[in-house]
Structures are given as C-alpha cells and as structure tokens.
Amino acid sequence: MTELSKYRNIGIFAHVDAGKTTTTERILKLTGRIHKAGETHDGESTTDFMVQEAERGITIQSAAVSCFWKDHRFNVIDTPGHVDFTVEVYRSLKVLDGGIAVFCGSGGVEPQSETNWRYANESEVARIIFVNKLDRMGADFLRVVKQTKDVLAATPLVMVLPIGIEDEFKGVVDLLTRQAYVWDETGLPENYSIQEIPADMVDLVEEYREQLIETAVEQDDDLMEAYMEGEEPSIEDLKRCIRKGTRTMAFFPTFCGSAFKNKGMQLVLDAVVDYLPAPNEVDPQPLTDEEGNETGEYAIVSADESLKALAFKIMDDRFGALTFVRIYSGRLKKGDTILNSATGKTERIGRMCEMLANDRIEIESAEAGDIIAIVGMKNVQTGHTLCDVKYPCTLEAMVFPEPVISIAVAPKDKGGSEKMAIAIGKMIAEDPSFRVETDEDSGETILKGMGELHLDIKVDILKRTYGVELIVGEPQVAYRETITQMVEDQYTHKKQSGGSGQFGKIEYIIRPGEPNSGFVFKSSVVGGNVPKEYWPAVEKGFASMMNTGTIAGFPVLDVEFELTDGAYHAVDSSAIAFEIAAKAAFRQSIAKAKPQLLEPIMKVDVFSPDDNVGDVIGDLNRRRGMIKDQVAGVTGVRVKADVPLSEMFGYIGTLRTMTSGRGQFSMEFSHYSPCPNSVADKVVEQVKERKAAEAKK
C-alpha cells in the first residue's frame, strides 16, 4: 500500500480542444501505464473510450486512471471540456484533492476554461496550470499567463519559460534550478538533455526567477525577511513555500510545453508530486443529517477510522455495472458487508478494481485516499454514502442542475419499448443530469438534459450501445410559469353522499414569491378554525398542483401560499378533504393572480475573431440577447450575453459559418425571465397544437 502522503487525487480540466485528453495520455505513457500514447484526433486515446468520444474527439465521461510517478500514486480523472457535460466536472471536483488546468498556448483562456475554473474555485481545489500546444502557430506562453490574471483573476506563478515558440519550440527552462530541458525531434518524451540556459534568455530567466522567489517567500515571514536582507533561499525552502501557497490557492504554479510533441511533461508530473496536496492535507468532508444539514462531524482521512466512502459515478460497461468510489476514511476489503446510508440497505462487496480507463486490475483491498471501482453493486446511485454497518453516516450530498431542454422519443418498433426502458434506467443511474419522464397526456417518453449535444449523445448511446432504434422529436424548451399579483381568496370543499361526508374550508392569500424560492407555505391561522393536523394536507394539496400551470401546463415557480383562516366539521373533516380543497383553490386562484410564462435564459460566452465581432453581436441581438460584456484579446474578442434558450438551437452551425469555423462558445443556464407577449402567445399556440395532434392519435 502507498502511504497516504504519497497519494495525489487529481483532475485535468480544460476547454474543448485545449489538449487535456492528450495530456492524460502522456501522463500514462511517462508513468509506464500504456506503451503507445493514443491520439485524440485518431480516436485512439485511453480515457476517451466511448464510441461517441472517439468519434467526436471530446471527453464525455470522467474516466478514472491510476498510475505511479516517483513513488507517488496518481489517481487521475480526465474531465469533459464541453459545457453540456459540466456536471461531470462538478462530480469529479467533489472527489479530487488537486488539479491540472490545461490552457491552449494559442487559444488562451477560452469560454469553458473560465466555467471550469470557477467550479474549481467554488470547490476549493488546488491547481497547477499547464499551457499546452506551444508548438502551435500563434502560441504565446506569457500572453496566456496574462490572460489567467485578467480573465480568471488568478495569480499564476511562472515556473518555467519556453525555449523557442511555434515550430521552433524545443523545451523549457526550469526557473528554480536554472536548467534548460531540451528535447530532440524524435517525439519521445525520454529523449531530452539538460543544458545551459540559452544566452539570449538569461536576463528574462533572472527576471522571472526573481518574481517567483518574491512571491514564494511571502508564505514564510522568516524566509521573506532573510531574502530582503540579501540571503537567497534554498530550492528546498522555495518548494516548501510554493507547496503551501498552492494548497491555499494563493497562487498557481504555471508550466508550459506540448503534450502532443512530448515536451515539458516531466516537469508537470514533478509539480504534481511537489506542490499538489495529499488527501490528508485538504479540508475533510463534512457529514450531514438526513435533511442535508451539517452535523459538525467530518470524514477524517485515515485508514484507522470507520469506513466513509462516496459513490460518485455509476457506469455500465462491457464488464458489467461499475460503481466508482472515493474512500475518505477507513478500509474496504473484498467480502466486506457495508451499509448504503441513503437506502438503509447493506451490501456485500464482491470484486474491486483500480482502473486504467476502460480496463481493470482487480484488487483485494483499498483504504482512505483511494479511488476505485466496485463491480456489481445494486441499488446504489451517484452521491450515495457507503459506510460501516456499525457506524452509519452521510457525506455531504451532490447537487445537480435542473435540465433545460427536452426531446420526445419513441422506439421505431413496438417490441423496443421494454428494451428502451431498461437502457434509459441504466443511463439515468450513470448520469444524474439526465432525466426521463412520461407525458401524462400523450404517453410519450420525454428525455431531459443540459443541452443539444448532451441529448444527441444520449440518443446515440441508445441506438448504438443498446440497439434501440428511435423516432426523435424536436427539442423542447423547459418553460415555467409564475404569478405576478397577490390574491386573497377562499374555497370550501363539501361533499355529502350518505354516511360521513367531506368538509374543508380554507381562506388564504397567494402572492408572488422571492426568485428561486419555489413553493413556500405559511399559516397564520389563529385558534382552531383549521386544526394544525390539517395544515400539512393543505400544503400538500396546493404544492401537488404546482407541476401544471394554467397558461400552458408548465410547472409553476415562486409562489407563496398563506393559510389565514377556514373552518372544519368535527365529523366530516379529514386530511383528504382539506387536500382536495387546496387543489381546487389552486385552480380557482392562480388564474386570478395574473400568471406569466417564464423562459430559461442562458449565460452565453462567445469567442469571435476581430473581423467577425460585428456579425456575432448582431446575430445575438437578433436572438433577443442582451450583451453584458466585451473583452478584447490578442486573437479576438470574448462577447458575453444573456440569451433565451429557445433562440440558441443550432447556434454552433451559425457561429461557424459567420467566423469561418474559428468561433467558439459556451452556454450555461442563468435564470428564468418573463417571456415577451409575442413569444408567450406562440408557445401557448404550439402547446395547443401539440395536444390536438396527440388527441387525434
């Protein structure tokens, strides 16, 4: 077993095409886990093992890989860069202790890089920066360093400088040791020599080395004082300070190279060992009660504690069902019986593996710090806590965003319904941001996801992985409804049909709630006019109707219901009577409260070459977008805007046409906003037409 201080659980984060999967491949090649590094553009990479990933050249799932470097165990997770799969990034951040942020040497800080960086900041994950693709035309290391300051508000700590650039890129100078690492043109990572610093770089190296030392010694008052008095710190002292500053995110050690050309990667691996934290050097995970409130207790990272582990990913592959688990505390052995605190059920551990992406190496035991896969677990979902039967506990839960787009699907042949249902069930277990429901009116199966590409991939998996041929409908926007006016009202439910009847009277106020408040229930009933035992029934009845609004049948958001008075009958009143009264009250009063249709607004971040900025902004304006910011860069302009989701279908094709394929964008849900009347009228009409068509079937 590797000692805990030598574990590094790291993720690799980047924008699409910045080279993070290739970076992972080179890590595996250098650490001896694979003999020939696959290329993403050839569809051969180790971590992009899904057919859809290999074909599209993007990472969709977070693939976990274990490897070793200088007696340290790396558990590496290669995460997606496309915005539709940021839930995978979030899920990975939950179980990581550190990360490598990969930026393109020519593209710089691109839209999705910023999103992933923000997620990592929120999760307090320490990172080093790797500026990749310095062999590319237009690459400029120091320009990207400046962008990380300007765009990400980060403090990069430059650790190396490139020798040459673009076609002339040969290697890097290590500022700490003042040594030049120069690779030959064979493309083999081990074919390098350590040389003197090139004469024309000496002054630049000394300038950046001085900046490095000045920043590092701020982590140690005694060292800083000695440095100010003219005493240069040792390399060991500097590394200790850099490690401390990296762990606290005071700065981010920044390296450069070319993963594709195998140049500069060894220094990045050394930096993972030297500067990123071990599992016992990060804040321990909090424990919560059943409602998700923190208890004040923590999962102490130690093999001597009772078992506390988090299932962070479920995957169905050619070997069967895999549950990926991060062990925070304790030990886990083959044959152990553990408790799933979310279900209250126990389960016996069968086979356990460490993963080389899509291949497995079976293991007998694992302990705190490990990321492993367990084969064949039942009734386990992403976010469930696995713990010692004698010491039940719950780790802080994962929260996933609500889907904003949906499509209707149906099997082409009648016999495919059961096959489709089984396949979708497995896919939901694997991806918590993918949802499914059945339309009550039409009986259609509705798939919901985070974006067009997300659902395209899911449909593709259903067809190719599970062999379900589908009829796929047009994408539908997840509209919502709300109210804009307060209404004071009352409703009496009375039913008499021999024997005991039903009676429940409620007086109430409904008013617009705070944004993102959902449904809020209050009671200001004085005395016993509506006994307290019936209040939950009133709340349940009204809340159950919030799923279907009165404008077009969309779910209702942000409504406050206050029960003010009412009446009951000693014999005829019951919880069910008051629940029915509340349901009828919803139908009666929501229409009086001036309901309004809401549409999802997306935060859109577009990169455009300078020549096309006017076209891009004009197009966003035509899509009812509101321009929030424009940031000029060296190679183009970043345009940030809020745009309705309904206007963004097919946008990538339009952007590529406008920019001759050079434009890029990312998009994530921002908020719900009132629909203009003209748009609302069209939506209502479309819903009516759809229902009429379904009624004829």
From Swiss-Prot:
Alphabetically ordered keywords of this record: Cytoplasm, Elongation factor, GTP-binding, Nucleotide-binding, Protein biosynthesis
Domain tr-type G: 5-280
Biological role stated in the UniProt entry: Catalyzes the GTP-dependent ribosomal translocation step during translation elongation. During this step, the ribosome changes from the pre-translocational (PRE) to the post-translocational (POST) state as the newly formed A-site-bound peptidyl-tRNA and P-site-bound deacylated tRNA move to the P and E sites, respectively. Catalyzes the coordinated movement of the two tRNA molecules, the mRNA and conformational changes in the ribosome.
Transmembrane segments: none
GO biological process: ribosome disassembly
Residues binding GTP: 14-21, 78-82, 132-135
Family annotation (NCBIfam families): EF-G, PRK12740.1-5, small_GTP
Disulfide bond is among the record's keywords: no
Gene: fusA2
UniProt xrefs under SMART domains: EFG_C, EFG_IV
Compartments reported by the entry: Cytoplasm
GO molecular function: GTP binding; GTPase activity; guanosine tetraphosphate binding; translation elongation factor activity
Protein name: Elongation factor G 2
Cellular component, GO, one term: cytoplasm
Pfam families named in the record: EFG_C, EFG_III, EFG_IV, GTP_EFTU, GTP_EFTU_D2
Family membership: Belongs to the TRAFAC class translation factor GTPase superfamily. Classic translation factor GTPase family. EF-G/EF-2 subfamily.
UniProt cross-references to CDD domains, sorted A to Z: EF-G, EFG_III, EFG_mtEFG1_IV, EFG_mtEFG_C, EFG_mtEFG_II
